[in-house]
């Protein structure tokens, strides 16, 4: 938002030219995320405690885990809020890769949210197998977009650059999708 608001004015006010630099926007995005987490963190913890949204510790678990009983869960909400807030404020929202990152983070956050909700309702979250499958699906969606729908895709899109080996760049072809799913 700040990029779209202030950068067009840089022709009249030269000090606003800093908004074109990704390093400037990245630094202030990080500062914004930190400030938001400090401002909202205690409030969110109090709200989660008020609504009794906390960890339930099994009786057959280790004794030192008993002290964690009632610890607020769903901390990912704070992370997602600060991430989305700082991204929407500082990023160039016309960049399709920003939206791809927002999709990935939101997708993984939805998986975590589902896991936390099931932990609260049933005492156990989603299985490791289901979580892995859902994460792979989000990763594959990103990979499919990058491989088949990205207008900026080049002939090097499926090549793997190996550090220190300038000439060695194997073309992964369709295996690129599995590589992306593994990396993400």
Q: What are the functions of these language-model segments?
A:
Residues 2-184:
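"…together with the soluble PPM/PP2C metallo-phosphatase catalytic core" -> "…together
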């Amino acid at each position: 938002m700040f990029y779209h608001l202030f950068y067009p004015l840089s022709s009249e006010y030269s000090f606003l030219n800093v908004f074109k630099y990704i390093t400037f926007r990245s630094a202030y995005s990080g500062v914004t995320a930190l400030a938001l987490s400090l401002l909202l963190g205690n409030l969110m913890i109090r709200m989660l405690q008020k609504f009794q949204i906390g960890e339930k510790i099994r009786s057959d678990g280790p004794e030192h885990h008993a002290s964690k009983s009632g610890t607020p869960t769903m901390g990912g909400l704070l992370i997602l809020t600060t991430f989305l807030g700082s991204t929407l404020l500082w990023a160039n929202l016309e960049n399709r890769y920003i939206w791809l990152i927002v999709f990935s983070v939101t997708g993984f956050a939805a998986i975590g949210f589902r896991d936390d909700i099931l932990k609260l309702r049933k005492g156990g979250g989603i299985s490791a197998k289901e979580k892995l499958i859902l994460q792979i699906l989000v990763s594959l969606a990103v990979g499919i977009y990058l491989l088949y729908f990205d207008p900026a895709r080049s002939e090097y899109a499926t090549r793997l650059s190996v550090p220190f080996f300038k000439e060695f760049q194997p073309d992964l072809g369709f295996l690129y999708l599995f590589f992306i799913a593994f990396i993400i």
